[in-house]
Every structure is written in structure tokens, then in C-alpha cells.
Design a protein with these regions (language model features):
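Active-site helix/loop module of the DD-peptidase/beta-lactamase fold
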Residues: 6, 24-60, 83, 112-147, ...
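Active-site Gly/Thr loop motif
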Residues: 130-132, 182-235
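Flexible, glycine-rich surface segments
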Residues: 126, 131-181, 185
């Protein structure tokens, strides 16, 4: 619990939060064209680039043809993204690629002069007592955005807690803009049809909808999850190393959110200590 864990695609929901702050502060609009922020790349050989908007990146609708095998060691991820071919014209269908989020990160850096994590620090990390975490970056100082963030489980719980309280912290302080919380976590687009119900309930702004009504999650490879249940005033953070993600989901839904309805259990100091010992030995 005291060791930062790689989040894989859970990083996307953190980047989304930065976009929410930037929108609230009037630094960008979801309808802004991506090329607006990168005029130095206007000579790109891909004319569809001129159609791309911030909203399309958020909802995985750039329809760029990029695979996980593409080189991430290059020094200019923006150039790599803009040079990549299109699978379909932009905004045609849901096509989940992490590079959409790396472009959002690059946009935040371009308009603020700061990396995403530096931009977030005074707005949410410092107020909630979260130490600035490590985030993989490119040669231009852009955080990866869609991957590569390392955070402790407890810090993740702090970060996402406002997402079940309309953006507010436990004391009522507004941390994340309430409008962003509502829009980012509701279904914005249809998602994939891969046979797994957890992936078929719709996608917001870098948040997945759950099969359970009024619930959503941040989601990363190998079982990294933060499940959010506003109705139960609860969230659950998981950090795993399970190659078959569906197994994590299957076990989780076996117990949650049903267990939230059990009420308060009687005090049992021995079992409580056993739980703490188990956590410490993880």
C-alpha cells in the first residue's frame, strides 16, 4: 500500500481530470481543433488531422491507426501521432488507443507550459496530501497521458474520491469542477462490442461505464481499477498483476456492490488486525 504501482490505462482518467480543469479555467474547449495547438505540424501529410477535436480524443474517436507495437521510444510523440494513418475518417467509431490521451497531455502542456502532473499538483494533488508521482514522459516533457503513471493505492482513492461526491472532498471543498465530473463519467459514446459486458456499457471522457447503474471506473491493464459508486458513497481501488483482466472483474462483481448493503458490521479487533497484516504483506 506504500509502494507506487504502475497504473497503465488508469492514467487516462487522471489526464481527463487535467482537461476538466483546463476547460473550467477557459484554457480550451472540447470543440477546439487539435491542429490549433500545434501549428508547427500543419504540413502533416494527413489532411484528416484538421478535423480532429479535443472531444474526439477524449471519447476515443480519432480513428487513428496505431498499435501497441508502434515505437514509444521516439522523441516526438505528437509528430508520431499526426503522421499516423487513419483507420477511418475521424469521429466514425470508437477505437481505443492510448495515443489519443498522450495528445491530450501534449495539449495541456502546450497551453499551460507545464506537464500534466505539474498542472494537477496545486489543483488536486497538494490539497489532498498526495505527493507528486512519477509519470513517464517524452523528449519534449509531455507526460505519457494514457499510460506510465505510478501512484499508491491510497493516493488513488484520494484522487478519485471527489468523483463520487460531485467533485467535492470529504469536507465539502470543491476540488474538481462538478460539471466535469458529471460529463466525464456519464456515457458519451458507445464503446466496444468484444463480448465482455464490462467493456460494452459505454465510455465517457476517459472513464468506463459499469454494468451496475450509476457507476463507473478508471481502468488499466492487468487489473488496475478504481470502481466508483456514488449511490453507495463508495469507491474501491485495485492494483493487481493479473494477465487475464476479466478474472479480476468476475471476482469483483461477485461481491460488489452487494456487500455495501450489509450495513455496519460489529467490531472485531482480531479480524481487523488480520486484514491489516494481510495488506502489509501484499
Amino acid at each position: 500500500k506504500d509502494i507506487p504501482h504502475v497504473l497503465y490505462s488508469m492514467s487516462k482518467s487522471v489526464t481527463s481530470t487535467a482537461v476538466g480543469f483546463a476547460v473550467s479555467e477557459g484554457l480550451l474547449s472540447l470543440n477546439d481543433r487539435v491542429v490549433k495547438f500545434f501549428p508547427e505540424y500543419l504540413m502533416s501529410k494527413r489532411p484528416f488531422n484538421r478535423m480532429l477535436t479535443v472531444r474526439m480524443l477524449l471519447t476515443m474517436h480519432s480513428d487513428k491507426l496505431i498499435t501497441v507495437l508502434d515505437d514509444k521510444g521516439g522523441t516526438d510523440w505528437v509528430q508520431n501521432f499526426l503522421n499516423a494513418p487513419f483507420l477511418l475518417p475521424p469521429n466514425t467509431k470508437f477505437n481505443y488507443i492510448s495515443e489519443n490521451t498522450s495528445m491530450l497531455s501534449a495539449i495541456i502542456t502546450k497551453i499551460t507550459g507545464m506537464s500534466v502532473i505539474d498542472y494537477l499538483y496545486p489543483r488536486i494533488l497538494e490539497p489532498l496530501g498526495i505527493e507528486k508521482p512519477f509519470w513517464e514522459s517524452d523528449g519534449q516533457g509531455n507526460n505519457a497521458g494514457g499510460w506510465g503513471l505510478y501512484m499508491k493505492s491510497e493516493d488513488l482513492a484520494k484522487f478519485f474520491l471527489p468523483y463520487i461526491h460531485e467533485g467535492k472532498w470529504k469536507d465539502g471543498t470543491q476540488i474538481i469542477p462538478a460539471t466535469w465530473v458529471k460529463e466525464a463519467t456519464r456515457k458519451q459514446v458507445d464503446s466496444v462490442s468484444d463480448g465482455y459486458i464490462d467493456n460494452m456499457m459505454g465510455y465517457g471522457y476517459q472513464f468506463w461505464r459499469n454494468p451496475i447503474p450509476n457507476s463507473y471506473r478508471a481502468d488499466g491493464l492487468f487489473g488496475q481499477r478504481c470502481f466508483m459508486f456514488p449511490e453507495y458513497d463508495a469507491l474501491v481501488v485495485l492494483n493487481c498483476g493479473e494477465a487475464e483482466d476479466y478474472k479480476v472483474m468476475k471476482v469483483f462483481w461477485k461481491y460488489f456492490p452487494e456487500c455495501f448493503g450489509y450495513g455496519t458490521l460489529p467490531e472485531n479487533k482480531a479480524e481487523y488486525q488480520k486484514m491489516l497484516d494481510t495488506i502489509d504483506n501484499c
